[in-house]
Amino acid sequence: MEAEHVDANNYYGVTVANGMIGIVSSPNPFEVKDVVLAGTYDQYGRGMVSNFLHSFNLLNAYLEIDGDRIDSRNISNFKQVLDMHHANFTTSFDYGDKASVSYTYYALRQLPFTVLMNISILAKRDIQITAASVMEAPDALKDVQNYYNEIETNKEVFPLLTSSAQSPTGKLLMCASNTFIFNEKGVNEPKVIHELWDSNMHFMKFTKKLNAGEKYSFAIAGSSITSAQMNDPMNEVQRMTIFARLEGVNRLIAKHDSAWNDLWKSDITIEGDEQSQQDIHSMLYHLYSFVRSGSSLS
């Protein structure tokens, strides 16, 4: 399913989910509208009832090219595509005559609390990019704590951006963590800098020069979990993010695609009616996205 003429004033986000964590799309580049965890409720908002809690927005990002921040006003050929067969969502656009950009995000099927965003930049001229991964807490959460660590293994050192917060009544501890995954290794990786804007938002960023014709790719992997699922969500969310980093982008996507190939073995085919076929595929896609074997959640 494709959308080539995106109107922010008439936009309803589509969800990419794995039965546990869901990502709702946004009409703005490098933004996701919401991140939702199944089974995560607390009393807030309208009425004295428990409502779904929005988790940390761990896939928001920004991109600057030659010092100019990318936004919906300075790009062209903006297109969004939902791949229902492999449950991913791709956004692509051009930035003047300087670069073509695309990114694809996944709620990884094999890792119920982990998401991935794979970003690709094709330089049309010599440019300098600054890319940031932004961790932002929804307004409903309280007592937000932000952390930044550099994790050292035998072969590399990599950044870990982490946040925790209490749910509105203090019933739950909510945690999220993410990291960059670079194709460069060791000392060749870009230098990552951490900045804290306020108690609800912090980010990590890097800067890199690209030559005309060069295609540069990197990824953001992150996890989110609460005390409703694990007794020690802070430790668990960092462990899951480190695991995703060590797996690498290719293995993460290959296992995700394989899991969705297995789900689509239960397909329904309608011949001679393309609209009905698309409707059926949409229903099956959302069914498979919102349920998960063994979770008792929907």
What residues fall within each predicted segment?
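Acidic/polar, glycine-enriched structural segments that form the non-catalytic walls/loops
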Residues: 1-16, 20-298
